[in-house]
């Protein structure tokens, strides 16, 4: 590496670093998903995700369509909620239903359970047939979560500074 390359200022980040920065910014600086739950009232969010496994395809999991909203919530909304609520515990149970279990009557509850420090603060949100956005909106509304001001959100610059 020449001295010229060492002292030359970078004009852009490398593509893989840029993708990572953009992903982090979606989590920490997205005003749509940035909410703070009352840490003195709630202690845990619990979700169960059910997967059906077919006998011929032992390696691949087939997601139950009633869980699509939960999966969308986990992928798009929960990372930001986790970041802004570090004292809140998030528990996700991945439950595999194979052919042996599917013959039995298994009660599949598509619930988002919110555990409070007191029993009166416990909440359940029915997730069947709802999109991730609707589940998230109901979570925010029922818990009384407070939206974080955009001025408080920190965004990592996507271009090197001089």
Where do the model's predicted regions map?
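Conserved beta-strand elements of beta-rich interaction domains across eukaryotes
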Residues: 52-54, 95-97, 119-120, 132
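Short acidic, gly/pro-rich beta-turn/loop elements at beta-sheet edges
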Residues: 57, 100, 135
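Helix-rich interaction surfaces within compact, conserved domain-sized segments
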Residues: 106-162
